[in-house]
Amino acid sequence: MTTIVSVRRGRQVALGGDGQVTLGAVVAKASARKVRRLYHDKVLAGFAGGTADAFTLFERFEAKLEKHQGHLLRSAVELAKDWRTDRILRRLEAMLVVADHEATLIITGAGDVIEPEQGLAAIGSGGAYAQAAARALLENTNLGPAETVAKALTIAGDICIYTNQVHVIEQLD
């Protein structure tokens, strides 16, 4: 598993993830890139779950963004519909967090599209730890989104054995 967290302050949004990939009880890779920029660098996306499944979803989501001229919510809903109804896609085990200047969304394998409260989203094995840390930081500091994401990932990595301290963080200003 992994940890992906997204934090929003105003129109600024940051999304980050750790780099650990495990195969059973073994760390197979420590520096995987689970966070990407999509649609002309206007959308951030991160995944938790099976790597091959996530890349399939990234490709599908990017195609939806192109089809709908970068409209995040419409693209997410269309991906979720496909994910829920397509027999092959239904078997994919991954979740996505996607964000642009206007919204942050969680897209699940069950076909749910969720806009989290407070501009804060977290998924993966360390997601609850990262979410709690980010929420405390948002409420009690003036850190920017990228700094908040970095600190939340560090805390999650200290607690969750499936999350490491190799971080990739992207921000939209």
UniProtKB/Swiss-Prot annotation:
List residues binding Na(+). 157, 160, 163
Q: Which GO terms describe its molecular function?
A: metal ion binding; threonine-type endopeptidase activity
Check the record and name the InterPro entries matching this protein.
Answer: ATP-dep_Prtase_HsIV_su (IPR022281), Ntn_hydrolases_N (IPR029055), Proteasome_sua/b (IPR001353), Proteasome_suB-type (IPR023333)
Q: Does the keyword Repressor apply?
A: no
Q: Which GO terms describe its biological process?
A: proteolysis involved in protein catabolic process
The alphabetical list of record keywords is:
Allosteric enzyme, Cytoplasm, Hydrolase, Metal-binding, Protease, Sodium, Threonine protease
- Summarize subunit and interaction data from the UniProt record for this chain: A double ring-shaped homohexamer of HslV is capped on each side by a ring-shaped HslU homohexamer. The assembly of the HslU/HslV complex is dependent on binding of ATP.
Function comment: Protease subunit of a proteasome-like degradation complex believed to be a general protein degrading machinery.
What protein is this chain from?
Answer: ATP-dependent protease subunit HslV
Q: From what organism does this protein derive?
A: Nitrosomonas eutropha (strain DSM 101675 / C91 / Nm57)
Give the gene name.
Answer: hslV
